[in-house]
Each structure stands twice: as structure tokens, then as C-alpha cells.
Amino acid sequence: MARAVGIDLGTTNSCIATLEGGEPTVIVNAEGARTTPSVVAFSKSGEILVGEVAKRQAVTNVDRTISSVKRHMGTDWTVDIDGKKWTPQEISAQILMKLKRDAEAYLGEPVTDAVITCPAYFNDAQRQATKDAGKIAGLNVLRIINEPTAAALAYGLEKGKEDERILVFDLGGGTFDVSLLEIGKDDDGFSTIQVQATNGDNHLGGDDWDQKIIDWLVSEVKNKYGVDLSKDKIALQRLKEAAEQAKKELSSSTSTSISMQYLAMTPDGTPVHLDETLTRAHFEEMTSDLLGRCRTPFNNVLHDAGISVSDIDHVVLVGGSTRMPAVKDLVKELTGGKEANQSVNPDEVVAVGAAVQSGVIKGDRKDVLLIDVTPLSLGIETKGGIMTKLIDRNTAIPTKRSEVFSTAEDNQPSVLIQVYQGEREFARDNKPLGTFELTGIAPAPRGVPQIEVTFDIDANGIVHVSAKDKGTGKEQSMTITGGSGLPKDEIDRMVKEAEAHEAEDKQRKEDAETRNQAEAFAYSTEKLVNDNKDKLSDDIVKEVTDKVNALKEALKGDDTEKVKTAQTELMTAAQKIGQVLYAQQGAEGAAAGAGAAGAAGAGASAGSASGSDDDTVEAEVVDDDDDKDNK
């Protein structure tokens, strides 16, 4: 049976884990690392690079390298590469395919089923886009679960005792979530993890802290050299990498040096060099507004759950950005001096929790029940542009709610159902999820027809809406796919393209290996000829040398079949060298053997002669004819 995995599809880094013997294990990637950079690049040759290898070449390939694509999930953003428009789902699918390949290599078996995480505050369109990305990558997405919930799942099973209230503070590379969960364990060790409230900001994360450093560096260069680096893509990429490194160093040091040579040139040809020192105090001062934005979601969660800070038993920090001292201090301040739990790895805990949930769904773990919530209220637009909520935020999912509405005009033949997600009073201020029309309503005065609108949120947090005219029985339904809505045929096309790209990449790898082997064989054969020229006939030397040159010539081109043919011909010719050398070796061995036998015979005669004085009696040979003559 194919293995199920848990995947944390992150803004900056991604991680994959699985259950081994019922216990979660983080899977090491092909490069030997436990996390994979969420970076995708398209090389000039058309090869798709993912992870560390894509990140390393970003400076020299800025326009064809995509990072932090998670921030575009659920939007109509695209990137044009060689005339093809790539959606966020397709870029994310490349990251998932890399994780899938590495997991299959690690486990030695196919990986098809996955639980993929997303920020708790992701709206419906973003969740649907995440699920579509998994589908394009060739995965059967068992469930989409919230990142803080996954973290609590991983933490709670290991550390949780009876009825503990856990606050998960999740600040990643691009998103921020706060979730409050209650973990209960019965006498049999069965855990129930229930989300009580969640809140967040989908556009707040480590990338924003990096950007503050970049802006500061750009400003310093402008003041010193009069050069605006904000328009220079290559310089900006170098600054981005330096800013990220500086941010990390300031988590353990009170200051860091940022030094870069030849960033750009001034109009008069003077090279732009950068050599700045950034202190932690200055960094915290320039990012204080970002830190302030973390307060509101925290306070909202406590308000929605109806609890005070003293009711929180444990605080769990998730996401690499929580390593920043200012963030840790803020959490301590917000929670009334509580020390955050340091027992979980903030980069891996989400994937570990997702792996546990995959085991629960597949039946490998029967000791836990997870109850999640919808992060945003759902409703429809009614007369006057009002947002009429059918499902309030923080409602446990899956859930289903219905409400009866009517027409606004006499003899109205149809109604337009406009679905929104959000907390504002007017529909226009919320996120539009989709629109559909219920037609064929029987003529009647306004307010008479009864139209039942039903919202159904599944365990992935994805919304299904239906409307039914109770008078005529006519019904219309839709699955909300949001602004990024990809129809099924579009997803199927993307799946096929992704498979084709994977096949192309595999072929490209095989071709590269063929060329490497051919090149090595050409040079080893050439060396063999040069080392044994005195033992080989001129004909053989010429034939093999010609074949070596033919193979080298084939290697200059792009035709792999030509390389294979040339290598086969060289192999055939090179066999003659082996035959000659082995034949000569055999002849030399035979000659040496004959010489040794002769020497042994001579030794035997000498031995006989030397022994004649002893007890040896020599026979006398008598010639009969000679004897007769003598008589």
C-alpha cells in the first residue's frame, strides 16, 4: 500500500514527514536537508530547478526564479516563462513534486496520499488553490489542515496532559496565525484536539522583516552613491539574500556586518560597494510596526474564545520567524510572562502534525480526534448590500447551515446568489468567493417564494453552496473555487503538463548521465591507447583514435542518440586493444613457463651427475652390431 505523508508547504521552506511504526519521521531530501527552500527556477535550457539548487542560482537568473509563491495562492497572479503563463498552483506543484520524489527515494515506495497544511487564516480560494497544487503534483490530497492545528497535534500528542489549553503563535515566512486549542486526554490515552478560535494575517511574515532591511540598505546606497538600487533586479536579489542572512544572525548576535562588493556602478563608472553594520536594536526599531501587527490577531483570538491570558496553559512557537528575540519577547508580554515551550522544532512541527493527521485518516493512528474551525464567516449579499452571515467564524468543521430567503421584487424569475467570506457588515468589504443564479422561480409577489440557501463546509475548509426554490423544487449548486478558480479540465491539463515536465526532467537527467559516461569512456580509452602504443599495431591505434575523436565530436552536439552510437562503436573498437594486450600477456606467460620448465630439466641432469659417486648404478648401453664385429 502506498505511503501517506504530511506536507508543510511553506512560504520560505517546505517540509515533509511520514509515520514509521506509528511515529512521525521527518524525511530528509536529496540534498540531505530536513527542509527544502520553496524556490522554483527555470534554467535557460528549460530545466525546472527546485529547492536549494534553485535558490543558489537566483542572482544570475532573477527573472526566471520564483520564491514566496504562497503569497499569491488564491489570486489570478501568473508569471510568464518562455511564453507560458504559470499559475501559483503550478509553481507550488513543482515544490510538492520535488518533496514527493525525495520521499519516494527515501522510503523506497510510491507516495500518493498527502495531508497538506495551509495558514489557519487562508480563505476558501487559497485553500482550494493549495488542494489544486497537490492534485497537479500527482498527489491524492486526503485533507487540507491548518498549520497551527497541525503544530498543536504534534505537540499535544507528545506533551499534552488532561484538558490543556494551548496557544499556537505561528509566524512563518509570509503568513501569521494565532490559534487557541484545547487538548484533552482520557484514561485510555485517546486525545481530542479542538480548535476554539483562530485569527491571523495572510500578508505578514519573515519576508516583511527582510524587506525592511532591504529598504534600509537601498536608502544607504542612495545617500552615499546617488544610485537607486530598487530598479536593479540583480542587486536587489543580492540584497535580499544578505538581508535574510543578517536577520538570522541578529537572532543570536547583537550586531552583524553586511558587506557586498560591486553591487552596481555609478553613472561616472565608480563601483558601488556596501559595508554596513546593523545592530539588533536598530533592526527592532525599523521593524516595530510589523511586530505591532501581531498584537491584534492575538487579542482577537482571546476575545473570540472568551478567555483571559491566565487561562492559557502552554504557548507553542511555530515558524522560523519566531526565532527573532523581539518576537519571543512580544509573546512573553502578550501572555503575561509565560515562557514559550521550546521542545518543538518550529521548522518541522507542522509537517510532523500533518503526518500524524495522515495516519489518523488512513487508520494508522486511532488515538486522536481533531476538530478544526473555519477562520472566517460565510454569508451572502442581501438587499441593500448587506452581508448576511450563515456560518460564523470559528465554527467547528465540517458543518452545514441553511437559511430561507425570498425575492425582493414582484414576479422575480431568478435570484443571484453572491457568496462572501469575511467579517465586515457590507458585502462589498468582504472577500467575494463566487456567484451563481437560481432561475425558474414561479411568478409571485415579493417575499412569497421560499429560497433555501445551504452552506456546507467540508473538513478541508472548502465551501459548497446550494440554493433551492422550495415551491418548484428547482436547485442550483456550486463548489466555491474563488478568484483563482481552476476548472477541472484546466487542472487535468496542468496535471498532464506536470507529468510531462517530470518525464522531461528524468530524460534530461538520463541524457546527462549518458554524456558523462561517454566522456569518461573516451578519455579512459585515449589514455589506454597512449599508455600501450608500443604494444599495439598502427591499424588498431588509428581505428581506436578515430572512434575516440568521433565520440568527442558527438559530445559537442545535443544529439544523445548520436553519442550512444559513437560510444558503442568505440567500445567495439576498444575490445581489440584488450584482445591484443591479453594475447601478449598470455604469450609472455607461456614463454616464461617454458623457460622455467627448461631450467627445471637442467637441474635434474645436474642432480643425477652429482649423485653418481653415491649408491647410484648407471646402466651400460651395449650396441649389438659393434659387439659382433669385435668378435
From Swiss-Prot:
Listed Acidic residues bias regions: 612-631
Residue ranges with Low complexity bias: 602-611
UniProt KW keywords: ATP-binding, Chaperone, Nucleotide-binding, Phosphoprotein, Stress response
Disulfide bonds listed in the record: none
Residues bearing the modification Phosphothreonine: 175
One Pfam match: HSP70
InterPro entries associated with the record: ATPase_NBD, Chaperone_DnaK, Heat_shock_70_CS, HSP70_C_sf, HSP70_peptide-bd_sf, Hsp_70_fam
Cellular component per GO, a single term: peptidoglycan-based cell wall
Domain of life: Bacteria
Induction: By stress conditions e.g. heat shock.
Function according to Swiss-Prot or TrEMBL: Acts as a chaperone.
Name the record gives this protein: Chaperone protein DnaK
Gene: dnaK
